[in-house]
């Protein structure tokens, strides 16, 4: 449970790496460092999924779909210093495309809360 190590991180990059390697269940992680760098990533370990892309429910019974270890911190989706100058999540989808495929496509708010923020 390395999450407590984020308080000793000196840079956004260090904090994101600690968050990625922490032993908690995956959840969104937003951080800012003393230099004003802001970022988003996933805190907790993400399994390397083989044989499916997460867009639809699927059976694991035949063995063609499986978990094969964990993603490395370098493979995690992340946002650093976005052009908008701000980051908010509000339980909504934060990334798309290849980055979304790594963490799944479902169970996100449709964006109304983001609009309110």
Predicted regions located by residue number:
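Accessory structured domains or lobes within enzymes
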Residues: 1-116
């Amino acid at each position: 449970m390395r999450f407590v190590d984020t308080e000793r991180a000196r840079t956004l990059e260090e904090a994101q790496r600690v968050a990625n390697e922490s032993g908690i269940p995956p959840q969104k992680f937003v951080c800012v460092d003393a230099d004003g760098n802001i970022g988003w990533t996933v805190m907790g370990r993400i399994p390397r999924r083989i044989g499916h892309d997460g867009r639809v429910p699927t059976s694991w019974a035949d063995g063609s779909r499986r978990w094969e270890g964990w993603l490395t911190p370098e493979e995690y989706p992340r946002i650093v210093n976005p052009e908008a100058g701000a980051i908010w999540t509000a339980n909504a989808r934060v990334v798309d495309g290849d980055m979304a495929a790594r963490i799944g496509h479902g169970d996100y708010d449709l964006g109304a809360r983001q609009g309110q923020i």
